[in-house]
């Protein structure tokens, strides 16, 4: 029987759009060959065996599902807008923005080579890799005559959002909207992070959200909305989506209200 690497076979069978996507699905344990999980992309498999992939995300990564919830729940329209994706990684947020009608997306990441191949070759995506968003200046991102982004989405790790907000403010033009993925484990002190890097205390989660919100308000951003991510982080952390804007008519929640929200969210996740 003929054999082939599983990652290339998935592409040949048009089950994946790129080898990179295939490798990601395989490593995530989402590919079954003859009803068995194969989690190594280089595994040689018989080409005639039945292959099944778990229900796949409509985006290049499941991060897109997180942003989709925010866009839907907050009723944010990105159609025809120039957007910025801070911490583009594989490109889930960017894919979501493009599918929602964004005109252009500037993707920024400290890493290199992680972006989905299809997005990398999409003329609507302008990549700025090996770049620290915290220190990025507008003149380093935009060419003369280019319209600056007016809407940003941010998903960063191993750095507090409070450190990148000043640069983000300068990179955006009016109406300066932003949706931030708040990851408590990167916002609170080490003493509040439990085993495997998980922040379980709702009050600590609320503190993370409140600190980011306060830092944003110091830059003249205003609160527009808060929701929980529909997906847990890789280690099991509950994550939140914070919507910022200017000239907001929505009352800003106080710390006690955010704690109550985090407690409700915690109860929902633990009861499932």
Model-derived regions, located:
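S-adenosyl-L-methionine
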Residues: 106-163
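Conserved class I S-adenosyl-L-methionine
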Residues: 79-89
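Flexible, glycine-/basic-rich loop-and-beta segments that form/coincide
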Residues: 238, 243-272
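Short, glycine-/aromatic-enriched active-site segment of Class I SAM-dependent methyltransferases
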Residues: 184-200
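A basic, amphipathic helix-loop patch mediating RNA/tRNA/ribosome contacts
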Residues: 1-49, 82
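A short glycine-rich, Lys/Arg-flanked "PGG" loop and its adjoining helix->strand segment in the class I
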Residues: 162-179
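Conserved SAM-binding loop of SAM-dependent methyltransferases across substrates and taxa
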Residues: 90-101
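Glycine-rich helix-loop-beta junction characteristic of Rossmann-like nucleotide cofactor-binding loops
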Residues: 14-15, 72-79, 145
């Amino acid at each position: 029987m003929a054999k082939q690497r599983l990652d290339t076979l998935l592409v040949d069978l048009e089950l994946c759009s790129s080898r990179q996507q295939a490798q990601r699905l395989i490593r995530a344990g989402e590919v079954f060959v003859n009803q068995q999980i194969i989690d190594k992309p280089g595994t040689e498999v018989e080409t005639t065996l039945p292959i099944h992939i778990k229900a796949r995300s409509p985006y290049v990564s499941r991060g897109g599902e997180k942003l989709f919830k925010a866009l839907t729940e907050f009723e944010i329209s990105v159609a025809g807008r120039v957007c910025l994706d801070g911490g583009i990684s594989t490109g889930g947020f960017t894919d979501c923005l493009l599918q929602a009608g964004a005109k252009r997306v500037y993707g920024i990441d400290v890493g290199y080579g992680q972006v989905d191949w299809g997005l990398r070759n999409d003329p609507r995506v302008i990549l700025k890799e090996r770049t620290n968003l915290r220190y990025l200046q507008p003149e380093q991102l935009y060419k003369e005559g280019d319209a600056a982004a007016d809407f940003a989405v941010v998903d960063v790790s191993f750095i507090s959002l409070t450190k990148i907000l000043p640069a983000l403010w300068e990179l955006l033009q009016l109406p300066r909207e932003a949706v931030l993925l708040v990851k408590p484990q990167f916002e609170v002190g080490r003493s509040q992070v439990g085993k495997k890097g998980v922040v379980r205390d709702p009050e600590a989660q609320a503190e993370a959200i409140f600190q980011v919100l306060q830092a944003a308000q110091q830059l003249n951003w205003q609160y527009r909305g808060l929701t929980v991510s529909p997906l847990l982080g890789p280690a099991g952390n509950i994550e939140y989506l914070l919507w910022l804007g200017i000239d907001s008519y929505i009352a800003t929640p106080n710390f006690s209200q955010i704690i109550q929200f985090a407690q409700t969210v915690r109860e929902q996740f633990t009861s499932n």
